[in-house]
């Protein structure tokens, strides 16, 4: 077959299709011999004739839903803006006034509320104030017991190291060791008196130099504690 067969077949197909749309209106894309091709003249004319009919509020297309559905016409939706505009300045002024009032309240009451805040270091440390019992965690107690097993008395440097390691204060470490020493002495005193009673002719034991040093150090610690308070 020659190529002319395909050309003639396609041409006949398009001409047959065009016969179906003989009554269709020419659009801006049609290229009739008498059509104007300068600018957008034909296109503007085609759309100008259809747009008013579709988007006109007064057309029957829009009148029928208003009348049948709500019993209202198109005029009910064309409300004037004056009734709303006259309330806007007052509304805006009220909102601005409320915001200003709130800002003034924050400025006035902010420092007053901040002044009522009491931090731990601001609390009074008078003799009338009752101190709560310090509670130690299991880990802190275990570490303190291990330290007490090796050293019943701590130097200032070692006390600071333990305080930093256990997240405690030097005062808490000091008080814990004081209480632990008193408990240890009481336990050993009871153990020494429990087995046998002291004979009547027995000479009272003389305190050793170590016991005296311990007592003097305890007295010094108590004096330091009173001075700190």
From Swiss-Prot:
Residues 129-188 bind DNA. It comes from Mus musculus. InterPro entries: Antp_homeobox (IPR050296), HD (IPR001356), HD_metazoa (IPR020479), Homeobox_antennapedia (IPR017995), Homeobox_Antennapedia_CS (IPR001827), Homeobox_CS (IPR017970), Homeodomain-like_sf (IPR009057). Belongs to the Antp homeobox family. The keyword Transcription applies. Its main location: nucleus. Pfam families: Homeodomain. GO terms for biological process: angiogenesis; anterior/posterior pattern specification; embryonic skeletal system morphogenesis; negative regulation of cell-matrix adhesion; negative regulation of keratinocyte differentiation; negative regulation of leukocyte migration; negative regulation of monocyte differentiation; negative regulation of transcription by RNA polymerase II. Keywords: Developmental protein, DNA-binding, Homeobox, Nucleus, Transcription, Transcription regulation. This is Homeobox protein Hox-A7. It is found in: Nucleus. Residues 213-229 have a biased composition (Acidic residues). One of its GO terms (molecular function) is RNA polymerase II cis-regulatory region sequence-specific DNA binding. It comes from the Eukaryota. Sequence-specific transcription factor which is part of a developmental regulatory system that provides cells with specific positional identities on the anterior-posterior axis. A motif (Antp-type hexapeptide) lies at residues 118-123. The keyword Secreted does not apply.
């Amino acid at each position: 077959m020659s190529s002319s067969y395909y050309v003639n077949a396609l041409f006949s197909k398009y001409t047959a299709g065009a016969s179906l749309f003989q009554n269709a209106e020419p659009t801006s894309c049609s290229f009739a011999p008498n059509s104007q091709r300068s600018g957008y003249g034909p296109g503007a004319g085609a759309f100008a004739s259809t747009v008013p009919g579709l988007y006109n509020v007064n057309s029957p297309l829009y009148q029928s839903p208003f009348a049948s559905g709500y019993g209202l016409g198109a005029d009910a939706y064309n409300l004037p803006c004056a009734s709303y505009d006259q309330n806007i300045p007052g509304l805006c002024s009220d909102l601005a006034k409320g915001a200003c009032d709130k800002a003034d309240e924050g400025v006035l009451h902010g420092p007053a509320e901040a002044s009522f805040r009491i931090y731990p270091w601001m609390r009074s440390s008078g003799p009338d104030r009752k101190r709560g019992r310090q509670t130690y965690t299991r880990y802190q107690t275990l570490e303190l017991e291990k330290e007490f097993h090796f050293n019943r008395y701590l130097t200032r440097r070692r006390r600071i190291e333990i305080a930093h390691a256990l997240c405690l204060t030097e005062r808490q470490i000091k008080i814990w060791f004081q209480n632990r020493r008193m408990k240890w002495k009481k336990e050993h005193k009871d153990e020494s008196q429990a087995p046998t009673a002291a004979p009547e002719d027995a000479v009272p034991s003389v305190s050793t130099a170590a016991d005296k040093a311990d007592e003097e150090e305890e007295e010094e610690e108590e004096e330091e504690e009173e001075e700190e308070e």
